[in-house]
């Protein structure tokens, strides 16, 4: 995240640590109102794309630019979630095998983001016809 999502990132990081998840923080490591999200999102997306068993959580003011940046990396499949039906979070994993979840910190509460993270991290990918579609994206 950049400065816009810094507080939410710290909250989610703490939430995941309590649940004993291994968390690698790609930044920002301190609040800097002049930082730029690509400096943090691109390295995070590269890490996720290089390890098929990893997942990433990114955020910014809207989450949109962050998802666009992440999706520039081959193998990264970032989706944006706002405070909407949780079924969207489930489907992003079940059908799209999303490996990066992006939040707009200006549009979601910390608690709702944590709820979405918990669901998203535990939702399996269905594979089958959905895998065939995703494979076409990476060719």
Which sequence ranges carry the predicted segments?
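Short, conserved beta-strand edge motifs with alternating hydrophobic and charged residues
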Residues: 24-27, 56-60
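Glycine-rich phosphate/diphosphate-binding loop of Rossmann-like nucleotide-binding domains
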Residues: 1-22
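Short amphipathic alpha-helical segments
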Residues: 10-13, 68-72, 114
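Short, structured active-site "lid" loops
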Residues: 39-58
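A short beta-strand-loop structural module common to alpha/beta enzyme folds
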Residues: 22-34
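C-terminal binding/interaction regions
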Residues: 1-7, 86-139
């Amino acid at each position: 995240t950049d400065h816009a999502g810094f507080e939410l990132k710290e909250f989610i990081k703490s939430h995941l640590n309590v649940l004993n998840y291994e968390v690698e923080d790609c930044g920002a490591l301190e609040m800097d109102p002049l930082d730029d999200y690509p400096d943090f999102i691109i390295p995070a997306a590269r890490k996720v794309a290089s390890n098929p068993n990893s997942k990433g959580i990114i955020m910014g003011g809207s989450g949109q630019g962050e998802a666009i940046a992440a999706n520039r990396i081959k193998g990264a499949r970032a989706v944006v979630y706002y405070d909407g039906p949780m079924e969207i979070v489930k489907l992003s994993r079940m059908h799209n095998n999303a490996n990066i979840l992006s939040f707009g910190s200006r549009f979601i509460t910390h608690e709702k983001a944590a709820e979405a993270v918990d669901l998203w991290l535990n939702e399996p990918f269905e594979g089958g016809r959905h895998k065939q579609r995703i494979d076409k994206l990476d060719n």
